[in-house]
Amino acid sequence: MYIEETTFIVQELVRKKNLLFPESNNKYVGLIHDSVHRCANVLRNTDALYHNFEHTALVTLCGQDIFVGKKIVDGGVSVEDWIHYTIALLFHDIGYVRNILKEDSGANQVVNIDGDTINVPPTCTDAHLTPYHVERSQLFLRERNWTQNIDLDLICAYVKNTEFPVPKNRLIENIDAKTIEMSRLVTSADLIGQLADPGYYRKIPALYYEFKETGADLRLGYSGPADLKTSYPAFFYNYVRPHISKALKYLNATNNGRSWVSNLNFHVFCEEHRAILSEEGMSLLQTISKKMAEERNFDNALHFILNNICDFQKWPVGHAYCRTKDANEYKMSPTNVWHIHKRTEAIDNFVAV
């Protein structure tokens, strides 16, 4: 499974590079291969319950769809921009793993550029390094040999900005506008890749026990995994959404990107309405969310949604309206999309009108 996952990520990154920059030919293919395998070889040894290679793979794939959207919407990016961005995604959480730095020794783990260390108790997992993993990730990158004119300072700047919660005093000075934006897109990919993961609910217990190991569960007021689930909407609106608006714009530019947005909205909506939705209702929402992510034809998607909602509610007739904004007012206009459970002459006459 490990080999299959690694091979898939390599193939997907090469495919994205060639799609985005067909003139680049085989440039960076070897570096992509080496980077993915280096990342996977380290992360497969972690005993952190959540921050593993699967999480990094999801963040990297989400980041690719964000980058594709940026190129479509704004343009102005190069294959060099892409490779630095992608390496940052691959290695943003590598610092969770113990004994990866030259000065790491047994239980003593380096936590900053000054060489300070902490002792990781034998009963703890790699999650114990959560407060230091961003700094350790940058140190790991700097200890490796890189070729092909890779700008390590740029990659480390991207990784540095994945620190979360985002510090109120975070300042990005003396950096050009593109670097600032790319740095923020790496952060967005980290957040969306986690929260829009189709398997996020299944992984919540793993994330909770990482929090518990560092005491973050108490600081956040969580008494169990269920608290992470119920607090999802508040966490999203208060801490995540302010930092991902640009990335959402780019994701909405492609079908693959919209699937991330759809999953994100689905998770938020479900937790906001869980108290009033039955299990069947939750299943219907998931079905609709999946259809919206896959369907290219809007009318087909609208027919599908209307039919399923009417069947679920046992409504014999349903009609879709289109809301448009005219000046400062919204107007509702009828469409040709109908759901009719059983046709009768009266209903046909009504539809005709």
Regions found by a protein language model. Name each.
Residues 48, 289-296, 305-314, 322-324:
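Short regulatory alpha-helical segment in sensory/regulatory domains of signaling proteins that mediates
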Residues 1-15, 19, 65-80, 91-102, ...:
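Divalent metal-dependent phosphate-bond-processing catalytic cores, especially two-metal-ion Mg2+/Mn2+ enzymes
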